[in-house]
């Protein structure tokens, strides 16, 4: 499975949150916590489920801290499948 970048992650976040354009996710958000971006634990569970559904990567919602951390977890997991 190919690695994903921030644009695809933002797409997933927007799909799961149900607010496609209300939050500013176009700026420098890599190191901003999901809590500071306005996402609660339910949204993180939905993001986690979407990552598993779309990418086959199982990451518990409570492990999702920031977009950068999420990308690291996803891309490490997908790289491990190829190796």
Swiss-Prot record:
<dbReference type="GO" id="GO:0016740">
    <property type="term" value="F:transferase activity"/>
</dbReference>
<dbReference type="GO" id="GO:0017000">
    <property type="term" value="P:antibiotic biosynthetic process"/>
</dbReference>
<keyword id="KW-0808">Transferase</keyword>
<dbReference type="InterPro" id="IPR006162">
    <property type="entry name" value="Ppantetheine_attach_site"/>
</dbReference>
<comment type="subunit">
    <text>The tetracenomycin polyketide synthase (TCM PKS) is composed of a ketosynthase complex (TcmKL), an acyl carrier protein (TcmM), a cyclase (TcmN) and a probable second cyclase (TcmJ).</text>
</comment>
<dbReference type="Pfam" id="PF00550">
    <property type="entry name" value="PP-binding"/>
</dbReference>
<keyword id="KW-0596">Phosphopantetheine</keyword>
<protein>
    <recommendedName>
        <fullName>Tetracenomycin polyketide synthase acyl carrier protein</fullName>
        <ecNumber>2.3.1.235</ecNumber>
    </recommendedName>
</protein>
<feature type="modified residue" description="O-(pantetheine 4'-phosphoryl)serine">
    <location>
        <position position="41"/>
    </location>
</feature>
<keyword id="KW-0597">Phosphoprotein</keyword>
<keyword id="KW-0045">Antibiotic biosynthesis</keyword>
<feature type="domain" description="Carrier">
    <location>
        <begin position="3"/>
        <end position="83"/>
    </location>
</feature>
<dbReference type="InterPro" id="IPR009081">
    <property type="entry name" value="PP-bd_ACP"/>
</dbReference>
<dbReference type="InterPro" id="IPR036736">
    <property type="entry name" value="ACP-like_sf"/>
</dbReference>
<comment type="pathway">
    <text>Antibiotic biosynthesis; tetracenomycin C biosynthesis.</text>
</comment>
<comment type="function">
    <text>Involved in the biosynthesis of tetracenomycin C (TCM C). Part of a type II polyketide synthase (PKS) that catalyzes the synthesis of tetracenomycin F2 (TCM F2), a precursor of TCM C, from malonyl-CoA. TcmM is an acyl carrier protein that serves as an acceptor of malonate from malonyl-CoA and acts as the tether for the substrates and intermediates of polyketide assembly.</text>
</comment>
